Amino acid sequence: MALEKAFGSKPYAFAVALLVLVGHITATELIVMPMLCVLASIAFFTCSSIKHFLPLLLTFIYLVNAKHSPGVPYWSDYYSSSYRIFIIVLFLSLLGASFIYYVAKQVIPRIKGIPPMLIPTALLSVSFLLNGIGCEGYKWASLGYGAAQIAVYFVLFYAIYYGLKGEDTDGLVSHLVYLASLIAMVLIGEMIFMLTTYDGIISADGAIVKEMVILGWGICNPIGFSIGILIPLFALGTQKDRKRGIYYYLMMMVCTLFAILTQSRNALLTAGAAFVIFAFFGCFIGNNKRLFRVMGSILSVGAIIGVIVFYDKISSLMSSLINMGFTDNGRFSLWRLALDYFKDSPVFGIGFFSFDENSYYNVAGFLPYMAHNTLMILLSSMGTVGAAAYAIYRISTLKPFFKKFTLEKLLLFAVVAYFILSSLVDNFVFYFYTAFLYTVVLAITQNIYDRQVIKK
């Protein structure tokens, strides 16, 4: 009992996040990773709740250092050479085995009756397995990638959903907001390290060079997305926690700023819009209207003064983003190509790894090249079957958020909305690590809904 309490505590979560940040900055991820895997494995064997796993799940990928990245611009073989691949496989296998033990010991016995959203989630999972099947030039890597999607959208979702059964849902939401602050600490810390140490990331005229915004695990778009999607959770924290409300409001501001500094236009639009929406409606709705009004007034005046005084520096710093304007950056040609592939293979698509001759090229080295739009990816890679299954699944996920509606669940849904809207021009729905937070939010919200039904 004492051990489980320790693993589920805020100090433990903070220690995990701090180790991830230190491991990334010092390029000692292969020292930190085994430590975290061993701790998580011990927790899986000794804890009844999966709460302990959330900080590791939501920060683990951020260990990857740009210098050692298997993706652009270094194409390093650091992780796959010598003894390092053995260390990675050994400790990830330990983590995987302990997770399977936990599912068998704690999750499966808790399944009573039909799990929520089972049929839609199962249909989506089957469509993942069938991606590209029967298509000429089918690549078996597509099957493996489909299985990885199932691991996130089916296995991980139900493991977290049942693993959190019995937890106080109010406490879970507060803990999730706290975890968001730790994720922000890691991401912003890594960005500060990048902006202050990468040679050439600031050009001679003071602009951030967009092509240099790389953290090993992602380039500007995934980085901006990973920071921006935290904004709804900080809006929730500002509404829910009057004592720490000002802290969470400031975190909303900081995350918006750093999301924009990634030079990602997607992040500029989504994070900027999210902040404005939450800051505005918080003035009229919820439990902390006075704080929203005061901070909004101060921020508005400060922003106007700041732009007037530092206009030249701001325009220089953001010139890479400004100069891009409203060009499609190749998206339209990708979407036309996706539709052509859909015409060639309309039932099951061409598969995830058949979209491009360079389909193994990507920032993480093992992700396929995709069409940068959820619908286009579904049509080209998974066909009509995949698109229909995803539509059924997506509709089914609305129920726990909007039935027995509350402001808290609306703000949790804002995380899902951010996830979906950002993916209109990117691949975040199918970069499985960018779906981890979404999966956690969905599992917690389903538990909240279950508790509401029981109370009735």
Name each region found by the language model.
Residues S82-L94, I114-F128, G137-Y162, A180:
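Aromatic-anchored transmembrane helix interface
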Residues F14-L21, I42-A43, P232-F234, K409-S422, ...:
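Transmembrane alpha-helices of multi-pass inner-membrane enzymes
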Residues P116-L123, S174-V186, M251-V254, N288-Y311:
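Hydrophobic alpha-helical membrane-interfacial segments at the cytosolic entry of transmembrane helices
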Residues G189-L195, A279-I322, L339-K343:
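A membrane-periplasm/extracellular boundary helix in multi-pass inner-membrane enzymes
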Residues A122-V126, V152-V155, G171-I201, G216-G282, ...:
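Alpha-helical transmembrane segments of multi-pass inner-membrane proteins
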Residues S319-M382:
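Long extracytoplasmic/lumenal interhelical loops at the membrane interface
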Residues A2-Y101, L130, F419:
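N-terminal signal-anchor transmembrane segment
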Residues M382-I420:
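Hydrophobic transmembrane alpha-helices and their immediate junctions
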